[in-house]
């Protein structure tokens, strides 16, 4: 028996991540078996025939929880009345493109998306940004949705966290469930800091269990930071199914209270925690308690951790300053 309904916008819905994602939302994996789902699927005009094919497949699955599908290239229509906006689509970086070019192109997209969310979404809307560079895209969207509380904007480092947990579990020879409190700090980029010092394996320090600091500092950190590029090299295209899985997991973290002794990584607006500039979208260790998202406090860094933390923080400052100079922030 269902007792509530959620309307979800998915941008880039006919893309590889979108295709891997929407069926799992419709089946109840994101919001649970008691929540009916309406899907507002957004694509560019040329991709609408492909999107209609996705909608046909959704129909053919006969998901009991899926009550409505809207396929559109109209951004305002896509955001109409949505409770969740999953901003998956973005322009990928192409050869010869500077990072500032990427920020400018996507900045225009996420400016419009923020405005549409502000003007058309439900009063309780929450926004989960996946399209890269996701931290700064989230910052731009948030900046252009002034009527939406800033604590309802998130960007995804869930995939990075899951990658890191897997690497630690494999190295330690333990089940994936044994690895907890695996924090990704900072930017969803190659500067991110996967904090193995504060991670736990069966409740004990991961560094102590693995007892190979050289592997942790060099192989582990670089493997997590470069995993996306490694997948592209092996598969010929970027992570799609694993990214979709991480979106499911990430949103689930945000709608379900966190078990005792656990935490998860999430990019959210800084309120000055750990010395991060207020207003930056930064990945922190988080917990959801009684429906409220809180940053885990009082974690400590050694010199190695502090250096990595500062590197990713400085990159996010640089991205913010770049988009500000481009007129994409107030």
From Swiss-Prot:
<feature type="binding site">
    <location>
        <begin position="12"/>
        <end position="18"/>
    </location>
    <ligand>
        <name>NAD(+)</name>
    </ligand>
</feature>
<dbReference type="Pfam" id="PF02866">
    <property type="entry name" value="Ldh_1_C"/>
</dbReference>
<feature type="binding site">
    <location>
        <position position="163"/>
    </location>
    <ligand>
        <name>substrate</name>
    </ligand>
</feature>
<feature type="binding site">
    <location>
        <position position="132"/>
    </location>
    <ligand>
        <name>substrate</name>
    </ligand>
</feature>
<feature type="binding site">
    <location>
        <begin position="130"/>
        <end position="132"/>
    </location>
    <ligand>
        <name>NAD(+)</name>
    </ligand>
</feature>
<dbReference type="GO" id="GO:0006108">
    <property type="term" value="P:malate metabolic process"/>
</dbReference>
<dbReference type="GO" id="GO:0030060">
    <property type="term" value="F:L-malate dehydrogenase (NAD+) activity"/>
</dbReference>
<dbReference type="InterPro" id="IPR001252">
    <property type="entry name" value="Malate_DH_AS"/>
</dbReference>
<protein>
    <recommendedName>
        <fullName>Malate dehydrogenase</fullName>
        <ecNumber>1.1.1.37</ecNumber>
    </recommendedName>
</protein>
<keyword id="KW-0816">Tricarboxylic acid cycle</keyword>
<dbReference type="Pfam" id="PF00056">
    <property type="entry name" value="Ldh_1_N"/>
</dbReference>
<comment type="function">
    <text>Catalyzes the reversible oxidation of malate to oxaloacetate.</text>
</comment>
<keyword id="KW-0520">NAD</keyword>
<dbReference type="GO" id="GO:0006099">
    <property type="term" value="P:tricarboxylic acid cycle"/>
</dbReference>
<dbReference type="InterPro" id="IPR010945">
    <property type="entry name" value="Malate_DH_type2"/>
</dbReference>
<feature type="binding site">
    <location>
        <position position="93"/>
    </location>
    <ligand>
        <name>substrate</name>
    </ligand>
</feature>
<feature type="binding site">
    <location>
        <position position="106"/>
    </location>
    <ligand>
        <name>NAD(+)</name>
    </ligand>
</feature>
<dbReference type="InterPro" id="IPR022383">
    <property type="entry name" value="Lactate/malate_DH_C"/>
</dbReference>
<feature type="binding site">
    <location>
        <position position="99"/>
    </location>
    <ligand>
        <name>substrate</name>
    </ligand>
</feature>
<keyword id="KW-0560">Oxidoreductase</keyword>
<dbReference type="InterPro" id="IPR001557">
    <property type="entry name" value="L-lactate/malate_DH"/>
</dbReference>
<dbReference type="InterPro" id="IPR015955">
    <property type="entry name" value="Lactate_DH/Glyco_Ohase_4_C"/>
</dbReference>
<feature type="binding site">
    <location>
        <position position="113"/>
    </location>
    <ligand>
        <name>NAD(+)</name>
    </ligand>
</feature>
<feature type="active site" description="Proton acceptor">
    <location>
        <position position="188"/>
    </location>
</feature>
<dbReference type="InterPro" id="IPR001236">
    <property type="entry name" value="Lactate/malate_DH_N"/>
</dbReference>
<dbReference type="InterPro" id="IPR036291">
    <property type="entry name" value="NAD(P)-bd_dom_sf"/>
</dbReference>
<comment type="similarity">
    <text>Belongs to the LDH/MDH superfamily. MDH type 2 family.</text>
</comment>
């Amino acid at each position: 028996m269902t007792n509530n309904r959620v309307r979800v916008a998915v941008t880039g819905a006919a893309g590889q991540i979108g295709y891997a994602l929407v069926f799992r939302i419709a089946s109840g994996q994101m919001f649970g078996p008691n929540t009916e789902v309406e899907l507002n699927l957004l694509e560019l005009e040329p991709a609408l025939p492909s999107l209609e094919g996705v909608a046909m497949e959704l129909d053919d699955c006969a998901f009991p929880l899926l009550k409505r599908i809207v396929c559109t290239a109209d951004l305002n229509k896509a955001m109409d009345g949505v409770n969740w906006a999953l901003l998956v689509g973005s322009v990928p970086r192409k050869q010869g493109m500077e990072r500032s070019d990427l920020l400018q192109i996507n900045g225009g997209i996420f400016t419009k998306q923020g405005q549409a969310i502000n003007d058309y979404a439900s009063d309780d809307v929450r926004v989960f940004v996946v399209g890269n560079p996701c931290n700064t895209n989230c910052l731009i969207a948030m900046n252009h949705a002034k009527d939406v509380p800033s604590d309802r904007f998130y960007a995804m480092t869930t995939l990075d966290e899951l990658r890191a947990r897997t690497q630690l579990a494999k190295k330690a020879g333990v089940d994936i469930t044994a690895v907890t409190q695996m924090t990704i700090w900072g930017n969803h980029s190659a500067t991110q800091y996967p904090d193995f010092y504060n991670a736990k394996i069966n409740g004990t320090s991961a560094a102590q269990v693995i007892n190979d600091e050289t592997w942790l500092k060099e192989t582990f950190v670089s493997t997590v930071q470069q995993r996306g590029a490694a997948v592209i090299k092996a598969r010929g295209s970027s992570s799609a199914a694993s990214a979709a899985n991480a979106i499911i997991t990430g949103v689930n973290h945000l709608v379900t209270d966190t078990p005792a002794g656990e935490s998860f990584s999430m990019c959210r607006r800084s309120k000055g925690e750990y010395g991060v500039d207020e207003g930056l979208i930064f990945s922190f260790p988080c917990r959801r308690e009684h429906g409220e998202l809180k940053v885990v406090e009082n974690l400590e860094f050694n010199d190695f951790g502090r250096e990595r933390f500062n590197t990713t923080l400085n990159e996010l400052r640089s991205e913010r300053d770049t988009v500000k100079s481009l007129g994409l922030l107030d």
